[in-house]
């Protein structure tokens, strides 16, 4: 099944056109087209090795693509790298924390490297979380270190935030705190975020758009609510009325092969009742991701 892209006609804060990247024989990105709406929080979801980190690194001008182009807030990072990077805040999975320095000295280090860095803004974000500025950074918990990395990114007052699996090593409470600080900042600043994760349940409460990346290709790109509304799940091959098969995977408990179906967007409301009558269940976002990844692998199976 090809890429499925939901309707989007607004302004893109981050755009990729025909983006491809290869590492020797491995295709990391395969003709990726992506438009992240301004003011949105977009979830970039896919398994390890899907190309999520490569996509973010190309957008940051850390990796040069083999073909295609990128625009960050209207600026090509490969033609105007300095200007583009001033518009981007970057949060890697493992933030660069200087363990021998205090939290505040880490912020001062960031200020010395970024001319527009707002150190007071970052301090306020950390103080909201009761993280002492005089604490040695090497003694921070994993969640606190992640918050420090986010505070550094937010201190740039960037219009676009790129977050590469920042929740991967956090416990549930730390994840919740991280998401809350991120959303507060986005609402107050009017910025845009692309938040990558290999677990959709980690990010579904924070995001309003879902992009599924598998095998270097975008498998689905649509508003989060549309992904929920237009997909159904059955344990049989017979389709719900007006539905198209997406992919099949082994369901929870390993007892049944489940099939994900997509209803036509314009008939989703009417199709819901018919789908339920035909024995179809609501599909969770995890089910949606599994179905599209299974279709992309061409095997028909994606173990849950």
Show the residue positions of the predicted features.
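Helix-to-loop junction immediately C-terminal to a conserved catalytic motif
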Residues: 60
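Catalytic Walker B motif of ABC-type/P-loop ATPase nucleotide-binding domains
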Residues: 161-165, 170
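The feature captures the beta-strand-to-loop junction immediately N-terminal to the Walker
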Residues: 45-47
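ABC-family P-loop ATPase nucleotide-binding domains
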Residues: 93-148
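Conserved structural motif at the start of ABC-family nucleotide-binding domains
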Residues: 14, 29-31, 85
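ABC transporter nucleotide-binding domain
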Residues: 177-263
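Conserved ABC transporter NBD signature motif
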Residues: 68-76, 83-84
């Amino acid at each position: 099944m090809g890429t499925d892209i939901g309707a989007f006609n607004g302004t893109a804060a981050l755009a990729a056109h025909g983006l491809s990247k290869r590492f020797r024989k491995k295709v990391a990105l395969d003709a990726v087209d992506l438009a992240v709406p301004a003011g949105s929080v977009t979830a970039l979801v896919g398994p390890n090795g899907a190309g999520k980190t490569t996509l973010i690194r190309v957008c940051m001008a850390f990796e040069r693509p083999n073909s295609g182009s990128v625009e960050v807030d209207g600026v090509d990072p490969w033609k105007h790298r300095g200007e583009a990077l001033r518009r981007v805040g970057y949060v890697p999975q493992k933030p660069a924390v200087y363990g021998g320095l205090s939290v505040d000295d880490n912020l001062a280090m960031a200020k010395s490297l970024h001319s527009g860095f707002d150190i007071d803004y970052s301090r306020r974000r950390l103080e909201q979380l009761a993280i002492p500025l005089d604490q040695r950074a090497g003694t921070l918990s994993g969640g606190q270190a992640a918050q420090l990395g986010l505070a550094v990114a937010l201190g740039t007052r960037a219009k676009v935030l790129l977050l590469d699996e920042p929740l991967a090593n956090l416990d549930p409470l730390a994840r919740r705190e991280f998401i809350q600080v991120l959303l507060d900042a986005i609402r107050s600043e009017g910025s845009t975020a692309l938040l990558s994760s290999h677990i959709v349940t980690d990010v579904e409460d924070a995001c309003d758009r879902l992009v599924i990346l598998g095998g270097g290709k975008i498998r689905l790109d649509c508003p989060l609510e549309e992904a929920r509304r237009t997909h159904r799940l059955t344990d049989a091959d017979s389709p719900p009325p007006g539905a198209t098969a997406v992919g099949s995977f082994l369901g929870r408990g390993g007892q049944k092969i489940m099939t994900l179906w997509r209803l036509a967007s314009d008939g989703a409301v009417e199709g819901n009742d018919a789908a339920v009558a035909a024995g179809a269940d609501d599909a969770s976002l995890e089910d949606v991701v599994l179905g599209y990844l299974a279709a992309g692998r061409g095997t028909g199976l994606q173990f849950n």
